[in-house]
């Protein structure tokens, strides 16, 4: 009886030990604790910079000067101030009848991801670490650093818990540490115009990301990660951020003499040939934002900026939402108004020029797209039902382009339902007479063209490319739409989830997506073969990246079509 009691006591004690909160030691002796979630140790809401408040609003992030001692890293931090994504989804609902066309198993997770950004605060520069349970500081596991998307106007690391990646990495026998970083978006992170340029605080959101990467370099070993094996990856604006981290400081991705990252994955995003931070577009965005915030734009640049810094967070949040929602959906005008722009500092030249001249970090990468990227954005032009309507809309979007340039776009993307997006659906899915045409233009302008620019310019690194078609003929009007792959990576472990998780985990471990995946061999992209992986719902095939060459090439060369 005594021995049985001792056994039970030992078992209870062991269970208590196993259930203890995971810990990590920072700065030599400052202990933080996290939460054990099944097979994953989680540390959420770790500050990596001082709060960008008061005089630090709109400025580059400053190193964290507080203490970590006793931090209970149990919960995600609030999102940074931003456009309300729930409004965007609601407008899509009204415009497309989203509830009718997106299957419930997809629609629910989309709204769940949006909920991750409901709580907002300017004090938002925090990151999260996910690792296999029980990982020791000397484990030296590869690190996957996630940069979220959201058109540079919304998004939050809380919407993308890393549990799915860590669990699958354990299953594969290729364990990783997953890190996600908050960064400022919209005017809080990408305010442009003469005033902010003169002050030297452009592209604050990019600097937030880089400050997070510096924190990883300094601290991730304390969580069992290897700072010499860091992969950055993201989707949409997150992928565009990855592209701009590749060209930051002309390709110098070093910090304290060591590389900040060693590989990259760009999902549905790449470099965009934005005009510089003091050009017409950013100035328009700056002045509209200031006006909506109640600041006098006729005053001096310094006075206007001081006024903006004096306003409450709620006033600026309302101002941003007023600007974003002034059009039907408002995403594209805002998308072209805010975002990373050349500033002579972190982005020293135009993005395409930096890649084409070899001024980028020489690391292996993967870049790919969904087949129908533009369908989620096409509602901005739902009222354009004739060619003259579309031309007028293009003149608004491409405000710096000549009439000849716009006419060429219209000729390359005719009002022929069978060649519009969703692609390969014949005359079906024509929500309006011009919907498929506009969707095709946006697919190629914003996503396909930047991907091909990168591939053609980066001949001296190993690179892989893919096209996802797994929702073909499954979702009316939207097809394999922008952002759907996130559902499979973070929410629903069905269909192509294995392809995304396993290829990407292998790439983080080996700089090769093919090791230990039990998936189709994914061949490297070459200029001669243009090898491309096509991701299906349950299987994959290799194909050639040779679709819509003339239309996509036009966007590669006519950069005045971008703002």
Curated annotation (Swiss-Prot):
<dbReference type="InterPro" id="IPR019826">
    <property type="entry name" value="Carboxylesterase_B_AS"/>
</dbReference>
<feature type="active site" description="Charge relay system">
    <location>
        <position position="373"/>
    </location>
</feature>
<dbReference type="GO" id="GO:0004806">
    <property type="term" value="F:triacylglycerol lipase activity"/>
</dbReference>
<feature type="glycosylation site" description="N-linked (GlcNAc...) asparagine">
    <location>
        <position position="302"/>
    </location>
</feature>
<keyword id="KW-0378">Hydrolase</keyword>
<dbReference type="InterPro" id="IPR002018">
    <property type="entry name" value="CarbesteraseB"/>
</dbReference>
<dbReference type="GO" id="GO:0016042">
    <property type="term" value="P:lipid catabolic process"/>
</dbReference>
<dbReference type="InterPro" id="IPR029058">
    <property type="entry name" value="AB_hydrolase_fold"/>
</dbReference>
<feature type="glycosylation site" description="N-linked (GlcNAc...) asparagine">
    <location>
        <position position="383"/>
    </location>
</feature>
<keyword id="KW-0442">Lipid degradation</keyword>
<dbReference type="InterPro" id="IPR050309">
    <property type="entry name" value="Type-B_Carboxylest/Lipase"/>
</dbReference>
<feature type="disulfide bond">
    <location>
        <begin position="295"/>
        <end position="307"/>
    </location>
</feature>
<feature type="modified residue" description="Pyrrolidone carboxylic acid">
    <location>
        <position position="20"/>
    </location>
</feature>
<protein>
    <recommendedName>
        <fullName>Lipase 1</fullName>
        <ecNumber>3.1.1.3</ecNumber>
    </recommendedName>
</protein>
<keyword id="KW-0443">Lipid metabolism</keyword>
<feature type="disulfide bond">
    <location>
        <begin position="80"/>
        <end position="124"/>
    </location>
</feature>
<dbReference type="GO" id="GO:0005576">
    <property type="term" value="C:extracellular region"/>
</dbReference>
<feature type="signal peptide">
    <location>
        <begin position="1"/>
        <end position="19"/>
    </location>
</feature>
<keyword id="KW-0873">Pyrrolidone carboxylic acid</keyword>
<feature type="active site" description="Acyl-ester intermediate">
    <location>
        <position position="236"/>
    </location>
</feature>
<keyword id="KW-0964">Secreted</keyword>
<feature type="active site" description="Charge relay system">
    <location>
        <position position="482"/>
    </location>
</feature>
<dbReference type="Pfam" id="PF00135">
    <property type="entry name" value="COesterase"/>
</dbReference>
<dbReference type="InterPro" id="IPR019819">
    <property type="entry name" value="Carboxylesterase_B_CS"/>
</dbReference>
<keyword id="KW-0732">Signal</keyword>
<comment type="subunit">
    <text>Homotrimer.</text>
</comment>
<comment type="similarity">
    <text>Belongs to the type-B carboxylesterase/lipase family.</text>
</comment>
<keyword id="KW-1015">Disulfide bond</keyword>
<keyword id="KW-0325">Glycoprotein</keyword>
């Amino acid at each position: 009886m005594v021995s049985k009691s001792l056994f039970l006591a030992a078992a209870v004690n062991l269970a208590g030990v196993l259930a203890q909160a995971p810990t990590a030691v920072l700065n030599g002796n400052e202990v933080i604790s996290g939460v054990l979630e099944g097979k994953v140790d989680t540390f959420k809401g770790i500050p990596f910079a001082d709060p960008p408040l008061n005089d630090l609003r709109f400025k580059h992030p400053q190193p964290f000067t507080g203490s970590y001692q006793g931090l209970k890293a149990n919960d995600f931090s609030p999102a940074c101030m931003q456009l309300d994504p729930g409004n965007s989804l609601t407008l899509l609902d009204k415009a497309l009848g989203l509830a009718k066309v997106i299957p419930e198993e997809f629609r629910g997770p989309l709204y769940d991801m949006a909920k991750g950004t409901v709580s907002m605060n300017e004090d938002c520069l925090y990151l999260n670490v996910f690792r296999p349970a029980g990982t020791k500081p000397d484990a030296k596991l590869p690190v996957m650093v996630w940069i979220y998307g959201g058109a540079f106007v919304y998004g939050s690391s809380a919407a993308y818990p890393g549990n799915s990646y860590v669990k699958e990495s354990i299953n594969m026998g290729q364990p990783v540490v997953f890190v996600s970083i908050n960064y400022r978006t919209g005017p809080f992170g990408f305010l442009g115009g003469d005033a902010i340029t003169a002050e030297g605080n452009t592209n604050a959101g990019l600097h937030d990301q880089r400050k997070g990467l510096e924190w990883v370099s300094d601290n991730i070993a304390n969580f069992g990660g290897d700072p010499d094996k860091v992969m950055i990856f993201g989707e949409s604006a997150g992928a565009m951020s990855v592209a701009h981290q590749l060209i930051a400081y002309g390709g110098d991705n070093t910090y304290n003499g060591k590389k900040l990252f060693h590989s990259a994955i760009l999902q549905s995003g790449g470099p965009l040939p934005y005009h510089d931070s003091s050009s017409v577009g950013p100035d328009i965005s700056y002045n509209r934002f200031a006006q909506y915030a109640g600041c006098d734009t006729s005053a001096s640049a310094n006075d206007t900026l001081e006024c903006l810094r004096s306003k409450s967070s709620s006033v600026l949040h309302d101002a941003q939402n007023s600007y974003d929602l002034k059009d039907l959906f408002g995403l594209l005008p805002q998308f072209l108004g805010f975002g990373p722009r050349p500033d002579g500092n972190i982005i020293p030249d135009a993005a395409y020029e930096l890649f084409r001249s070899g001024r980028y970090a020489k690391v292996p990468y993967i870049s790919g797209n969904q087949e129908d990227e533009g369908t989620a954005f096409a509602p901005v032009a739902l009222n354009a039902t004739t060619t003259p309507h579309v031309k007028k809309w293009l003149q608004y979007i491409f405000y710096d382009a000549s009439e000849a340039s716009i006419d060429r776009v219209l000729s390359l993307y005719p009002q022929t339902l069978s060649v519009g997006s969703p692609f390969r659906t014949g005359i079906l899915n024509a929500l309006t007479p011009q919907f498929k045409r506009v969707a095709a233009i946006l697919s190629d302008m914003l996503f396909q063209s930047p991907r091909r620019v990168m591939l053609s310019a980066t001949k001296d690194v190993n690179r892989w490319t893919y096209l996802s078609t797994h929702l073909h003929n499954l979702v009316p009007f939207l097809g394999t739409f922008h952002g759907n792959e996130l559902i499979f990576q973070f929410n629903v472990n069905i269909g192509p989830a294995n392809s995304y998780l396993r290829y990407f985990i292998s790439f983080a471990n080996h700089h090769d997506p093919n090791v230990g995946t039990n998936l189709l061999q994914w061949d490297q992209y070459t200029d001669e073969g243009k090898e491309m992986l096509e991701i299906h719902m349950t299987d994959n095939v290799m194909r050639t990246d040779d679709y819509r060459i003339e239309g996509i090439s036009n966007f590669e060369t006519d950069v005045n079509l971008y703002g």
